[in-house]
Every structure is written in structure tokens, then in C-alpha cells.
Amino acid sequence: MRDWVYGFFMAWGMFLAIPCPKKLWSETARRKMLVCLPLVGLLVGGIWAGAWLLVRGAPGPVRAAVCAAVPWLVTGFMHLDGYMDVCDAVLARRDLPTRRRILKDSHCGAFAVICLVLLALGQWSLFLSAESIVWQALLLI
């Protein structure tokens, strides 16, 4: 049982920006951590749903902005950095070694910024239009 608790807190500490109540690492619980990842996803989804409930009475654009931002904030923008790196490299239209160099570069290029803006606008508009189809939108989450 202890390995399951350790595994959950290890997954939490690794994939969420929310401070973990217990900073644990156990090699024996490492496999349990992988099994606990869906629980961490449910935690993110629960926070997301809670944020949506908190802003129910707010104007539509505010609700949409909060719903688009919450998963990024909760996960510490984890996957967003990789998304931007890939957009920078793929859209550069260069040879393979140059693309690899772009992937390793810590600076943010124009393609990354453009793709981030398009992603944010797409999510915002999805949540803005989802107010009339709330239950269908919740099924997507």
C-alpha cells in the first residue's frame, strides 16, 4: 500500500505545478507511479471542472479564458514548451540537422509564438462556443 501512495505522490510531483504535500522518491514505487498517472489526470480534470464551476456566472469570454488557461497553469505549462519547440523546428523548412539544432535551442522563434497564439485562440474560441453545448464539451474533457 505504501508503494501506491508513494507512486501517486511521485506522479503528482513530476507532472503538476501544484506543490506536492510529500516529496518522496522510491525506486520500488516507480512502476506504481506509471499506474497512478491517470489519477493525476483526474486530479487535473477535477481542478479544471472546479474552475469552470467557479466562473459560471462570469461573462463568456472570461469563462473561456479561465477554462483555456487552467490546465496549462496546473501542469506548469509542461507540454506547451515541447509543442512550441516542435512547431519551431517543423515549420522552419530546413534540413534535418538544422531542425535538430532548432529543437535544442532554448530561444523561442517566430513559428513557436505564432503556433502558441493560434492554439490559445483555438482553445478560447472552443470554450466560448461551448456554452451552448456544455455537456458535449464536458465529454471532451
Regions found by a protein language model. Give the residues of each.
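Short helix-capping/hinge motifs at transmembrane helix termini and TM-loop junctions
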Residues: A17-P21, R56, E131
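Membrane-proximal soluble regions of multi-pass membrane proteins
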Residues: M1-W25
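Short alpha-helical scaffolding segments that buttress acidic/His motifs in well-ordered protein cores
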Residues: A11-F15, A69, L103, I114
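Membrane-embedded alpha-helical segments that form the functional core of polytopic membrane enzymes
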Residues: V35-C87, W135-L140
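C-terminal ends of transmembrane helices
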Residues: P19-L24, M78, P97-T98
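A short, glycine- and basic residue-enriched loop/turn
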Residues: E27-T28, D81
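Multi-pass membrane catalytic core of lipid/isoprenoid biosynthesis enzymes
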Residues: R30-W48, A89-L140
